[in-house]
Amino acid sequence: MDKDWMVLLQQQNQLSKMMEVNRATERYGLSLSEQDAKMILAERNHALQRERRVEFGEGIAPQIIYEFCDSDFIEQDSYADTIIRLQEIFYMYKNEMQDEISDEELLHFMKEQFETVCFGDLDYLAGTCLAIFSQAIRAGYRGYRASEGRGEYGAFDEVKRWDYDLYLEMLKELCWR
């Protein structure tokens, strides 16, 4: 009986913490209903079971919310689903990187790629950016530690991106003859 009481109290604390983050996210036009928060917490448990992970404390969802709340690519209609998907991706790649990277480093890396390389595409984030980065981590790369995961993807990116200077030069040539 004591065990059930403790679990119930822990769940209530986690729910309270999830509802607290609304204060920070409301200025970005994002908020969670109590039902959304419960759904995120339930999906957290499923993701932890699927990835065979154990987590103590409040979980990663509040940190994900704080990290991603100012994104231009997250809208209110898909907010809860996006947080759930980011949570799943986070746990999957914590395992893939064999816990070599801290939560903060992984979150910073995820956010930077989500904004600048993936432009909000969660499948590209998980299937390309994090897959490539996790291979580097497993192979022994540790350069991310100095930058806390920021600015690291360029060294591993296999996809040719736009050359900004060339683009401007061509734009000037075409438009300002």
Each model region followed by its residue ranges:
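Acidic, low-complexity, intrinsically disordered interaction modules
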Residues: 31-169
